[in-house]
Amino acid sequence: MKALVILGFLFLSVAVQGKVFERCELARTLKKLGLDGYKGVSLANWLCLTKWESSYNTKATNYNPSSESTDYGIFQINSKWWCNDGKTPNAVDGCHVSCRELMENDIAKAVACAKHIVSEQGITAWVAWKSHCRDHDVSSYVEGCTL
């Protein structure tokens, strides 16, 4: 019985933690989901963005007190503009998706929303990209990855 309780807590901690992608694994996944070159944004730039936004973690969240909104998932997509978390005042829900879905281990919905965002606002919609990736050599983010 004790072993079952310990095993239950282990599974619970994995479910709460989410998936933290390995860099090349994420590169392959993003390429498969059509982000490489999407709207002129290279795969290396997407990897740089996700590294600085979430450290490749699907369950990452960040509360923004000034806007009373939260950033969700591997792309840190904001609940004020892009997803519905049921608690952000005057939310727009531009991607027509639940914020919870943006934190799934299967990142297809998060990628679809990121595509929508970059189509409307460009890659500069992400502050981390402007701070850490723009005007930098980002080639190291895909270096050594078998794509």
UniProtKB/Swiss-Prot annotation:
EC number: 3.2.1.17
SMART domains: LYZ1
Disulfide bonds: 24-145, 48-133, 83-99, 95-113
Domain of life: Eukaryota
Substrates-to-products reaction catalysed: Hydrolysis of (1->4)-beta-linkages between N-acetylmuramic acid and N-acetyl-D-glucosamine residues in a peptidoglycan and between N-acetyl-D-glucosamine residues in chitodextrins
TM annotation in the entry: none
Pfam family, one: Lys
GO biological process, one term: defense response to Gram-positive bacterium
C-type lysozyme domain mapped to chain residues: 19-147
Keyword Lipid metabolism: no
Signal peptide (UniProt feature, chain positions): 1-18
GO MF term set: lysozyme activity
Annotated catalytic residues: 53, 71
Tissue expression from the record: Stomach-specific.
Keyword hit for Signal: yes
Alphabetical keyword list: Antimicrobial, Bacteriolytic enzyme, Digestion, Disulfide bond, Glycosidase, Hydrolase, Signal
Family per record: Belongs to the glycosyl hydrolase 22 family.
Role played: Lysozymes have primarily a bacteriolytic function; those in tissues and body fluids are associated with the monocyte-macrophage system and enhance the activity of immunoagents.
Quaternary context: Monomer.
Note: Lysozyme C is capable of both hydrolysis and transglycosylation; it also shows a slight esterase activity. It acts rapidly on both peptide-substituted and unsubstituted peptidoglycan, and slowly on chitin oligosaccharides.
Designated name of the protein: Lysozyme C
Protein species of origin: Bos taurus
Gene that this sequence comes from: LYZ1
